[in-house]
Amino acid sequence: MLGAIAKKIFGSSNDRRVKGYRPRVAAINALEPEMEALSDEALRARTDALKAELANGKSLDDILVPAFATVREAAKRVLGQRHFDVQLIGGMVLHEGGIAEMKTGEGKTLVATLATYLNALAGNGVHVVTVNDYLARRDAEWMGRIYDFLGLTTGIIVHGLDDAERKAAYACDITYGTNNEYGFDYLRDNMKYELGQMVQRGHAFAIVDEVDSILIDEARTPLIISGPIDDRSDLYVAIDALMPRLAREDYDLDEKQRTVSLTESGNEHIEELLREAGVLKEGDLYDAHNITIVHHVNQALRAHTLFTRDKDYIVRNDEVVIIDEFTGRMMPGRRYSEGLHQALEAKERVTIQPENQTLASITFQNYFRLYKKLAGMTGTASTEADEFQEIYNLGVVEIPTNRPVERVDEDDEVYRTAEEKYAAIIAEIDKAHARHQPVLVGTGSIERSEHLAALLERHGYKPLDYSNASAMEEVYAAARDGRVTKKFAVLNARFHEQEAYIVAQAGVPGAITIATNMAGRGTDIKLGGNVEMRVTQELAGLPEGPEREARIVAIKQEIEENRAKVLTSGEPADPAAGRKTGLPGGLYIIGTERNESRRIDNQLRGRSGRQGDPGRSKFYLSLQDDLMRIFGSDRMDGMLQKLGLEQGEAIIHPWINKAIAKAQQKVEARNFDMRKNVLKYDNVMNDQRKVVFEQRREFMAQESVRETVDEMRHGVVDDVVAQHIPEDAYPEQWDIAGLRASIENQLNLDVPVEDWAKEEGIADEEIRERLRKAADEAYADRVTRNGPELMAYVEKQVLLQSLDHLWREHLVTLDHLRQVIGWRGIAQRDPLNEYKSEAFELFNGLIGSLREQVTGQLMRIEIMMQEPEAPSLPPMFAQHLDPVTGENEFFLPEGSGSFGAAGGAYGYAAQGLNTEGAVLERDPADASTWGRVGRNEPCPCGSGKKYKHCHGRYAAEA
């Protein structure tokens, strides 16, 4: 009560913050006459003048007013659009690293140009982030005209570009692209082997459009670059065939938490079925050697119980394609991890793609926190303000609309069954269509949008292709004549190619559009129709000239007439029905269910009432809807029955809206907690990721990594000595045999450690120093034989590829640890602290393994120098096999072996050892094929002796 009174007197904190921007808005407005007086050349020259001011010590804040005034004037000249005062405020919020909440149609795309231009003047690059390739291209081409006019360059990052094109786009002053492309480029950059191959040039400032969709809805979804592993398709198919044989009591399903697990009886039943099918051959299901089968069973169970076709995914062209639960868009190329996608493919009887191993991954939460400054725009952020502040340190500012919102948001109508609800929706669509009022019907899934489409067809409506010019002309003719067409369009993941047409024309008189969640659609619904879309569609083949201009004028005039019809298409007052006042015209939003998030509902509502237009929104619900069913519909159903609610009757009351809003708040709070928890765990990996990626970058930046290689070699010596000669131990307690074996295995050295150990008074420190010296001399000899320049290249490749190999294994290990760490809670131990502790130990192990792997490879590698001009030589390559596992550890790319030397060039083919001790590409019977052989390497003849004790001895004697 007191808070409400104080707010009336003093205004909200948001009002006060907005008021704080007004003086600078006035200053920008004061510069407008001066800017209008400048010629195009003089206005363009403002960019260089502002850059000079920055170079002379001024800050971006110091030049904000003239920079914004410059952009406003450029937009007027190039686009014919002038930034409103509230848009200037939005630009200031973005520049300060905040989130500007702006209603639909308030010009977010134009607002971004202000902060983008100002920050681009610093020369560090600005990334503008959109949710799909279409919007990235559209905004870059549209707003790029302003930047080009002012002398700045614009690049676009979309799917399908090669590295050279990406690098050029990132080198521009301003880069537009999708969140996925930015994230994947970052991961790919950190898998490159030369700095010059990296495409991104840093993370200075990013403006994220639809920021709530990217940083909230997709926060839990990691970006993953993966590689294929063994084919297990037979196992997926075999286990999938058993799922229909499970009874409902065999598993516990929690739709609220989206979890499923086998019951005790279910475990016994599935074990019996697995034995019958021959999948479980020995032991019990939960024996250690059967853990893979358990994993596949769990994923198959999830696929059958938690994932629904045409809601969570669709099947298209023999593929399972994920559907974004928040936007309804298809996400081709995205795959569920941990074998879940393969389980879905087995369920749907499509080709099972190989399972993948994670090579690199990052969440959007951690990627966007790389930026020194981050800002965002959306129409709906205030409901998630706490999360933006806590996780990203982003404050939300609600920007006032340029004109008051005239949309009427009605109370929900709640029916007992879905059948009654859909009957009411069809009746409401009929009434609106008869008045020529355009209707946008929002659904939660493809399945429901197609169900509603089928119901409309049963009631005499026909589907319409909005991208078909002749079909649309029929709609426009009906609008001119005042006829109803009884046509509708469906916008979901199946018809995403027509998205721009469908959304742009959804404001035509009498239009009926069924759409899955409207988050991130990015195209405004303009009452009467969209001029640009109609010109593109109808005049594509008409050249510039008087006829084209006349047609454009006619289209504009018709759209204005249609707009007038839509504005007057509201429902008149009906005193008999208890409605004393009429309901407005404009776009009518009908929601067929409430989403888990209030924000998604608000996004749907926000499609109507843009820029002061009238509009109307209403949600039709049933107790069978997901949200109502999961959150206590049984109690409400009993209450409605007691109230004597007849079939087809609805209950309408503000209390119902409040109860639903509370249920949504519960879900939002739960999802926030889940995202926070995910972030806590991911932060552990993120800290390690930053260390590894930074170390990689340092290695690539160095001309030589010899110093690092030497330190690693010394570290291996120290570890070996410490392992076999305990501190303060007596000589008779030393494990000299083990020490010798480790020296030969890890350092490829043959030294008389037994003799050293027998010397009077010798200490472990002396042995350590002798081993270091012997290892240094052996490596120096190898460098001399192979050539310092070439060895420097090989050292860097071995170091980078060994680090990558171990990092990939580390990611898998951390992932497995994360899956099981929750069980520590049963023992009253904090799983997060346990995870941090064990992840730290694993990371230390990675560092130790890197030392050993790099040292072991470099102490064995031999590089055969060959003349490059020899025509019979095969393509040059380098490879080295791990001396223990025989795995191929690194490859030098073809053609990368040219090194200037004495006016010529060298080719190389580095050869390593296989596990039997034979040198690859060498004929044991022909010594002329052996090339140079290291003294401590196995003799190529196959005797099993070291070269120095076999043919090397004969060569020395000779």
UniProtKB/Swiss-Prot annotation:
Lineage per the UniProt record: Bacteria, Pseudomonadati, Pseudomonadota, Alphaproteobacteria, Hyphomicrobiales
Membrane topology qualifier: Peripheral membrane protein
Main subcellular location of this protein, as a coarse class: membrane
Key words of the record: ATP-binding, Cell inner membrane, Cell membrane, Cytoplasm, Membrane, Metal-binding, Nucleotide-binding, Protein transport, Translocase, Translocation, Transport, Zinc
Name of this chain's protein: Protein translocase subunit SecA
Organism: Methylobacterium nodulans (strain LMG 21967 / CNCM I-2342 / ORS 2060)
GO MF annotation: an example: protein-exporting ATPase activity
Gene: secA
Binding site for ATP: Q87, G105, E106, G107, K108, T109, D524
EC number(s) per entry: 7.4.2.8
Enzyme class: translocase
Disulfide bond residue pairs: none
